[in-house]
């Protein structure tokens, strides 16, 4: 029974439809009966009374954590790149869940088995291998499915669950990456903001990128009002193109909040009365798409998202975290954990994807 193929052959009389023989065989089990009783070829552990939400690998880990087969499968990181070596074992990951909120409907055993460890606040978890982060867990969520849904290239996931499982999950969400790369500035699941200055700037963010040309005087006004620091001022001023300065300016205003929006509004009224009128009075400023972004490769779309490399929170380190599901890439890995909502669109952050593009 040392091979997965041999174990799979024992399931010809397997009685359950909700748990596949392939998953059980991959987790080290072969069928012995009666009923739904299976045994591990390596540790001899026996399990039965399976339920619809059970995952074979998770249950194997939970009941027989010292199984040598699991040790070989889960702890040998020599074949794939690991983001956090200290969390490469199931035991290490499981220990991080000692203060896991009891109100969260997903169990630590499931999360640790799927490669996640607890970050210590709210319900934030991160994969030890791909560094993908998830939060906002709901009843019925399967950690393996969510792992495959958002981080299909994770090498740990591929090794443990197999490409067939990942492809099946991805096929259930055919437009997921397009959604992630659409970078919507108006998340549908958020309560509408009152129509104030900040919300108008947020709503017309992309249009302002195109139409705003008087960046430096507004930047100086923000510095004089002590809304931004000299470092933040200089980072934006040093951009070589006005369009790049405009992007940075608008995004830092969205991060700083209402007072920054008020300074922007007052400065714009003096410096560019026509743009002020279209944005704040008539509210008819238009964004003109210059090209069909969907025609670009996924990698090129990410490269363009990463064009502005400075984190909009610390204005120091490079951006490296894409928020799920809004797709905005505006913060570094150190600033991301403290944020619950995207500073650009105010959408709830349900997960993070780390980018490594040069």
From Swiss-Prot:
The residue intervals holding the BIR repeats read 4-70, 90-157
- Report if keyword Repeat is assigned: yes
* Gene Ontology biological process terms, A to Z: apoptotic process; negative regulation of apoptotic process; negative regulation of necroptotic process; positive regulation of protein ubiquitination; regulation of cell cycle
Q: What SUPFAM superfamilies does UniProt report for this protein, alphabetically?
A: DEATH domain (SSF47986), Inhibitor of apoptosis (IAP) repeat (SSF57924)
Which terms in the Gene Ontology molecular function aspect does this entry carry?
Answer: cysteine-type endopeptidase inhibitor activity involved in apoptotic process; ubiquitin protein ligase activity; zinc ion binding
Q: Where is the CARD domain?
A: 193-283
- Record's Gene Ontology CC terms? cytoplasm; nucleus
Checking Gene3D superfamilies in the record gives: Death Domain, Fas (1.10.533.10), Inhibitor Of Apoptosis Protein (2mihbC-IAP-1), Chain A (1.10.1170.10), Zinc/RING finger domain, C3HC4 (zinc finger) (3.30.40.10)
Which residues participate in Zn(2+) binding?
127, 130, 147, 154
Write out the entry's keywords from A to Z. Apoptosis, Metal-binding, Repeat, Zinc, Zinc-finger
On whether Zinc is a keyword of this UniProt record, the answer is yes
**What Pfam families is this protein classified in?**
BIR (PF00653), CARD (PF00619), zf-C3HC4_3 (PF13920)
Q: Where are the zinc fingers (RING-type)?
A: 311-346
Q: Which InterPro entries match?
A: BIR_rpt (IPR001370), CARD (IPR001315), DEATH-like_dom_sf (IPR011029), IAP (IPR050784), Znf_RING (IPR001841), Znf_RING/FYVE/PHD (IPR013083)
Q: What family does this chain come from, according to its entry?
A: Belongs to the IAP family.
What PANTHER family would the database entry show? BACULOVIRAL IAP REPEAT-CONTAINING PROTEIN 3, INHIBITOR OF APOPTOSIS
Name the UniProt record assigns to this protein: Putative inhibitor of apoptosis
Per the UniProt entry, what species is this protein from, by scientific name? Sus scrofa (Pig)
């Amino acid at each position: 029974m040392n091979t997965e193929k041999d174990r799979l052959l024992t399931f010809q009389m397997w009685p359950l439809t909700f748990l596949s023989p392939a998953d059980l065989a991959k987790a080290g089990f072969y069928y012995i009966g009666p009923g739904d009783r299976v045994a591990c070829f390596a540790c001899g552990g026996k399990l039965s009374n399976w339920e619809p939400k059970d995952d074979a690998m998770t249950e194997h880990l939970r009941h027989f954590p010292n199984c040598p087969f699991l040790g070989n499968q889960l702890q040998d990181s020599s074949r794939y790149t690991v983001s956090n070596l200290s969390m490469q074992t199931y035991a290490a990951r499981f220990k991080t869940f000692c203060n896991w909120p009891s109100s969260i409907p997903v169990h630590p055993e499931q999360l640790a088995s799927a490669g996640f460890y607890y970050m210590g606040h709210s319900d934030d978890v991160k994969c030890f291998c791909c560094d993908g982060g998830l939060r906002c867990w709901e009843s019925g969520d399967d950690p393996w499915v969510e792992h495959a849904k958002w981080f299909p290239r994770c090498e740990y996931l591929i090794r443990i669950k197999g490409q067939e499982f990942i492809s099946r999950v991805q096929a259930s969400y055919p437009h997921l990456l397009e959604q992630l790369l659409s970078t919507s500035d108006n998340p549908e699941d958020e309560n509408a903001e009152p129509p104030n200055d900040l919300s108008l700037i947020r709503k017309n963010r992309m249009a302002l990128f195109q139409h705003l040309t008087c960046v430096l005087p507004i930047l100086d006004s923000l510095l004089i009002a002590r809304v931004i620091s000299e470092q933040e001022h200089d980072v934006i001023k040093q951009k070589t193109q006005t369009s790049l300065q405009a992007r940075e300016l608008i995004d830092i205003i969205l991060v700083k909040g209402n007072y920054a929006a008020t300074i922007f509004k007052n400065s714009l009224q003096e410096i560019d009365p026509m743009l002020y009128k279209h944005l704040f009075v008539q509210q008819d400023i238009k964004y003109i798409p210059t090209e069909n972004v969907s025609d670009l490769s996924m990698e090129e779309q990410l490269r363009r998202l990463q064009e502005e490399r400075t984190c909009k929170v610390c204005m120091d380190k490079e951006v490296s975290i894409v928020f799920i599901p809004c797709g905005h890439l505006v913060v570094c890995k150190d600033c991301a954990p403290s944020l619950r909502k995207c500073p650009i669109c105010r959408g709830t952050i349900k997960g993070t994807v780390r980018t490594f593009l040069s």
